[in-house]
């Protein structure tokens, strides 16, 4: 009876529309009813998260086919329609999205009076668009939602950013990502003219010439590389993180950076396998350089958010190495590391937000000795610092280990350079923790700092559970994605 109920009433359209309906309800509530606004926003986001967990329970990991498939004709053309579904490559990105949105609402809980209901609506709309990106199996609609995510994020950074340069950072973020995607739009139009469809499942059975594959692969790469971001188109990310509110940084690090790598997995690699093999040495070289460069750059930063932002660039370029190893270990490890990064990096930005709420600065030199005034915060910060270093037993370790195994099978030199990047990662992580938590207290007023309150502890708990769960028992996650990853490798004949 329960299975029949779930099959009938739990589908992707309901999941996608849930935050939209919540936003519509909030439009009719006056800003003065702040308690009701907060409660509705939190309830809608939690319902969406529980909805995604039900889909996980119903998900069949033994098949590589798309599940919960829905199709709707929205244009008067036979091969262009709203077509969506999920598989092992996209399932956990949907769950990660629905997990982080309630956190973002809780983060802005105390400042909701100044933010207003528009703040919650912006995050709910952002959730709707990001879930749609991970579910769309039509190239044209994927592009529409892929680009539409920019709008609420532009507003979140530009309106609720924390410093005077927030407008510049918002425009830089918007223009970088928009201009990169123009090439993908042209490629989609070219595909439509050649094949007459934008249906992914049809395109996966279409054989493009090697020359056409290379042209299309480059166009898609120009769009996805900016979102990852890969060097040298990573400049927008540190500025966006520094100026964004804490919840905005959580979405940027936790979800938005995954859109580019997901695009590689969903479209570039399976649709253009010959071009992928051709450009793999280029990706390996670019990613290895980026890991070393950004790790060294991180050691020179003085802003807490910039340190974590550059660390994110290094981790996401490690993800690209794993994906383009084109084997089961590398791709599976890259997906696991993306999920881990979504938890660990988001938690580190929350730690910075805790300090900024109390001190109104993110400069490292103003901190030190917090272990004596904020022991609970120091313990949590230490835990996520270790997770960022990929300590065994934490979520990042398994992902990085599998990526190294996959990379060694493809190119041992690049894998060796990545190992050097891990050493540098440990260096800047420990340096940051030592400067902020250890040593002597700097200004006298640091003695008046309050430790984590109940709401903040409650926010960190799910991250702690997730990081430990993925680190101690990753089989739950790897089993769900294994069949889809194997199918991807076999489809491209990469093995």
From Swiss-Prot:
Keyword Nucleus: no
Transmembrane spans: 9-29, 39-59, 89-109, 118-138, 139-159, 173-193, 214-234, 245-265, 272-292, 313-333, 335-355, 367-387, 388-408, 413-433, 457-477
EC numbers: 7.1.1.2
Subcellular location per the Swiss-Prot or TrEMBL entry: Mitochondrion membrane
Keyword Cytoplasm: no
Top-level division of the source organism's lineage: Eukaryota
Molecular function via GO: NADH dehydrogenase (ubiquinone) activity
Membrane topology type: Multi-pass membrane protein
Primary location: mitochondrion
Keywords, alphabetical: Electron transport, Membrane, Mitochondrion, NAD, Respiratory chain, Translocase, Transmembrane, Transmembrane helix, Transport, Ubiquinone
One of the protein's GO biological processes: ATP synthesis coupled electron transport
Pfam families, per database record: Proton_antipo_M
Function, in words: Core subunit of the mitochondrial membrane respiratory chain NADH dehydrogenase (Complex I) that is believed to belong to the minimal assembly required for catalysis. Complex I functions in the transfer of electrons from NADH to the respiratory chain. The immediate electron acceptor for the enzyme is believed to be ubiquinone.
Similarity field: Belongs to the complex I subunit 4 family.
Name of the molecule in the record: NADH-ubiquinone oxidoreductase chain 4
Organism expressing this protein natively: Triticum aestivum (Wheat)
Gene name tied to this protein: ND4
């Amino acid at each position: 009876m329960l299975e029949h109920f779930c099959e009938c009433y739990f589908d992707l359209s309901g999941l996608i529309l849930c935050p939209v309906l919540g936003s519509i309800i909030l439009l009719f509530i006056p800003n003065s009813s702040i308690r009701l606004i907060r409660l509705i926003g939190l309830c809608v986001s939690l319902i969406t998260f529980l909805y995604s967990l039900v889909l996980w329970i119903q998900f069949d990991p033994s098949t590589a086919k798309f599940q919960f498939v829905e199709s709707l004709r929205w244009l008067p053309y036979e091969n262009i329609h709203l077509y969506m579904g999920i598989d092992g490559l996209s399932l956990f990105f949907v769950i990660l999205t629905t997990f982080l949105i309630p956190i973002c609402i809780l983060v802005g809980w105390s400042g909701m009076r100044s933010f207003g209901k528009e703040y919650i609506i912006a995050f709910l709309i952002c959730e709707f668009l990001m879930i749609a990106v991970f579910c769309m199996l039509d190239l044209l609609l994927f592009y529409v939602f892929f680009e539409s995510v920019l709008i609420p994020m532009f507003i979140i950074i530009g309106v609720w950013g924390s410093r005077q340069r927030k407008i510049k950072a918002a425009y830089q973020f918007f223009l970088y990502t928009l201009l990169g995607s123009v090439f993908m739009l042209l490629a989609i139009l070219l595909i439509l003219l050649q094949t007459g469809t934008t249906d992914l499942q049809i395109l996966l059975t279409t054989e493009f010439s090697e020359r056409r594959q290379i042209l299309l692969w480059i166009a898609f790469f120009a769009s996805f590389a900016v979102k990852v971001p890969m060097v040298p188109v990573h400049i927008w990310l540190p500025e966006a993180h520094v100026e964004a509110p804490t919840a905005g940084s959580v979405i940027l690090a936790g979800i938005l950076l995954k859109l580019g790598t997901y695009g590689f997995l969903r479209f570039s690699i399976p649709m253009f396998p010959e071009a992928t093999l051709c450009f793999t040495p280029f990706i390996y070289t670019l990613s290895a350089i980026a890991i070393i460069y950004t790790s060294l750059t991180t050691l020179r930063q003085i802003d807490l958010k910039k340190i974590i932002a550059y660390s994110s660039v290094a981790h996401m370029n490690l993800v690209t190495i794993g994906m383009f190893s084109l084997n089961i270990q590398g791709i599976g490890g890259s997906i696991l590391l993306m999920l881990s990064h979504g938890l660990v990096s988001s938690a580190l930005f929350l730690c910075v937000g805790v300090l900024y709420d109390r001190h109104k600065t993110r400069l490292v030199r103003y901190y030190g000795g917090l272990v004596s005034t904020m022991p609970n915060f120091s313990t949590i910060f230490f835990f996520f610092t270790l997770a960022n270093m990929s300590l065994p037993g934490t979520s990042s370790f398994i992902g990085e280990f599998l990526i190294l195994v996959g990379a060694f099978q493809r190119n041992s030199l690049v894998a060796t350079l990545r190992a050097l990047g891990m050493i540098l990662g440990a260096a800047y992580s420990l340096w940051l923790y030592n400067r902020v938590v250890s040593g002597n207290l700097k200004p006298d007023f640091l003695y008046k700092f309050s430790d984590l309150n109940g709401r903040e502890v409650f926010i960190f708990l799910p991250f702690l559970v997730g990081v430990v769960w993925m680190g101690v028992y990753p089989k739950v996650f790897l089993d769900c994605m294994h069949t889809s990853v194997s199918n991807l490798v076999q489809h491209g004949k990469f093995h």
